[in-house]
Amino acid sequence: GEKLKIQKNDFVQNTKMSDKALRKAIKDTKQKNPIRILKASKFIKDKYKTDLEKVISAYKEKGYRDARIISDSVTFDKEKNALSIKINVEEGNKYYFGDIKFLGNTVYTDQGLSRVLGVKKGETYNGVLLEKRIADKSKPDAEDITNLYQNNGYLFSNINAVEVKTANDTIDFEIRITEGPIAYFNKITVVGNDKTNDRVIYRELRTKPGEKYSKEELVRTIREIGQLGFFDPEAIDPKFKNVDSGAGTVDIEYNLVEKGSSQIELQGGYGGGGFIGTLGLSFNNFSARNMFNKDAYKPLPMGDGQKVSLRLQASTFFQTYSVSFSEPWFGGKKPVQFSSSISYSKQFLNNFVTQRADKTKSFNIMTLSVGLAKRLTVPDDFFVLSQSLSYQHYDLNNYNTGLFTFGDGTSRNFA
């Protein structure tokens, strides 16, 4: 049905937090504001319920553990054709963190866990922060205690913060930890790659059979697969299968959805005295080894993760052609990218009498280049060492522009 606009958000019985602060907490149920143009003030029931929870979270972040919503109402104003929302809150008292003890930890010391928790005795109670430092569900690679264990093989670990004592305005906590056995990756499979060959994906996997389970490596693998550009990054789904705490093993099945990786560029316009046309083709999952396999043309040989680009740009006074090729795993065993390209451009002088290109007067440039880029391991594998070699050949044919003292000749350059 019709999404109604929100005329006003009112809060009742709030003395510890201002209306402005509480309105800021509700992200998707904003009241009408002529200044705000990027966020619509429309009422959506599901988002409204979520925003009510965010009001309580805002209180918990400021120490008000017992804050709750006593009642809320949504009324319709026929004259303004809009809704008015009233939220009645009970704030409660402000609390502070007391003693925080760790129980069940043998792998990490209390001091090490305290540094990760980042909460100290005497600080204002913050239930949202405490929950995130135990397990931040909004960030899979967050620096929290759960990830600390799971990045070190403890897939079956369980961490809970339990209130054990409340005295006046102080709350004591126990962080109860069940570490469990170390888990190892067992069988690793990939499904859904209808076009891309298995080896292109498996060489990017950081979760290898027999190695200690690591959530960090699992998250990194998802990111690496997404960066290939051949699959929908939002649809990458690692399924945990045959999880066996007794044997300490887990199978991972990566479910993928292929997406189009080729691109076509077609542009046209007027400039520099005439029409300029551009045609570009880019094939980002090419297979050079199948170029002579007629059965692989569907319509082109694809699936090996190589990139081929062709580009043509032309007008009355110039022409440019270029072809490039890159292989991200040169030799197939290590992440060493090989790249090569060739380009040729031809530019004609303008005949000022006829205002046309003089095809007898040209400046030609041919460029060849090759390069290697190796992924390093020190200081980490985000660093790349690259080197390249290029060759240019210049050819002047009756090209007298006044910039040179000559109009004919050739030159070569290596770099």
Residue ranges and their predicted role:
Residues 1-228, 233, 242-249, 256, ...:
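Interaction-mediating elements
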Residues 5-6, 19-20, 24-36, 41, ...:
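Gram-negative/organellar outer-membrane beta-barrel architecture
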